[in-house]
């Protein structure tokens, strides 16, 4: 099990000094799928990181739609191929498909058609992932951020429908708790879980800072399932210099005591 933070690589040296294992960057900063190869600078940025960049989130910009009438298969295919090839070249193992602005179902649009569009997109993710040796993970988002794929259980419907080793499931503690989802769904999804995001429910602060969130029930399920993948802190207003060490200690202690 490796612990990282969703942040810029500019914080990597500080993270390394505190004992973190990796950086989770933003796809729009590091993979830049909208740019041509001669414009891409993410490889140069990654080479300056004091820690490996093992994962990336925010797969899609809001301008690229996965659902609705503005779905453009050709543009998405070009974008995904760039992302896959670039992720492989800099050693990124996991790319997160959250992208609420891209997959949000437009008002009045047929929901079953939107679900079919997402299934097609997930198939495309699996193909690109397989070709480049990376794993895409489907992230559930709370309803305030997106109106589709709001739970682990719902994310799993797309993972199971795709049925491919390059497409797996992410568990996000903040979104899980926000939706009051039973942790038993995590146990059911355990064989397909390949990435984890952490934040307290109260204020979406980094683990332990609110003093009110207990990760042990979820960590217990992960440990029972022999989870040995990446776990990233994805929190609001996380002052890494001030709080990074105690957050890391808190997560490690909760894991050990689960």
Stretches with model-predicted labels:
Residues 1-21, 77, 82-85, 91-93, ...:
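Histidine-acidic metal/acid-base catalytic patches
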Residues 66-168, 178:
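Active-site acidic/histidine proton-transfer and metal-coordination neighborhood
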Residues 45-73:
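Short hydrophobic interaction/assembly module
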Residues 45-49, 87, 129, 222:
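A generic structural signal for well-ordered alpha-helical segments
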Residues 6-10, 26-30, 56-61, 100-102, ...:
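Active-site beta-loop-alpha junctions enriched in small/polar residues
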Residues 26-48, 99-109:
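Glycine-rich, proline-tolerant flexible connector loops at the mouths of alpha/beta enzymes
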Residues 14, 18-39, 57-65:
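N-terminal substrate-binding region of glycoside hydrolase catalytic domains
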Residues 39-40, 120, 180-184:
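Short, conserved clusters of charged catalytic residues that mark active-site
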């Amino acid at each position: 099990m490796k612990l990282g933070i969703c942040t810029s690589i500019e914080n990597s040296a500080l993270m390394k000094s505190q004992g973190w294992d990796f950086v989770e960057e933003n796809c729009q900063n590091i993979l830049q799928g909208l740019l041509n190869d001669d414009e891409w600078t993410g490889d140069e940025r990654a080479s300056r990181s004091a820690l490996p960049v093992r994962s990336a989130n925010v797969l899609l910009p809001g301008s690229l739609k996965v659902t609705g009438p503005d779905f453009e298969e050709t543009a998405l295919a070009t974008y995904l191929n760039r992302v896959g090839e670039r992720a492989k070249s800099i050693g990124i193992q996991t790319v997160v498909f959250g992208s609420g602005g891209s997959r949000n179902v437009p008002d009045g649009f047929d929901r079953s058609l939107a679900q079919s569009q997402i299934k097609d997109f997930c198939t495309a993710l699996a193909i690109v992932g397989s070709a480049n040796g990376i794993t895409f993970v489907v992230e559930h988002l709370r309803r305030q951020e997106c109106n589709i794929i709001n739970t682990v259980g719902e994310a799993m419907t797309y993972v199971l429908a795709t049925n491919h080793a390059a497409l797996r499931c992410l568990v996000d503690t903040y979104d899980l708790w926000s939706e009051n989802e039973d942790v038993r769904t995590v146990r059911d999804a355990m064989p397909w879980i390949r990435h984890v995001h952490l934040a307290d429910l109260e204020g979406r602060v980094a683990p332990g800072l609110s003093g009110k969130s207990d990760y042990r029930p979820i960590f217990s399920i992960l440990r029972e399932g022999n989870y040995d993948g990446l776990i990233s802190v994805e929190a609001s207003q996380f002052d890494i210099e001030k709080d990074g060490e105690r957050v890391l200690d808190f997560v490690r202690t909760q894991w050990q005591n689960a």
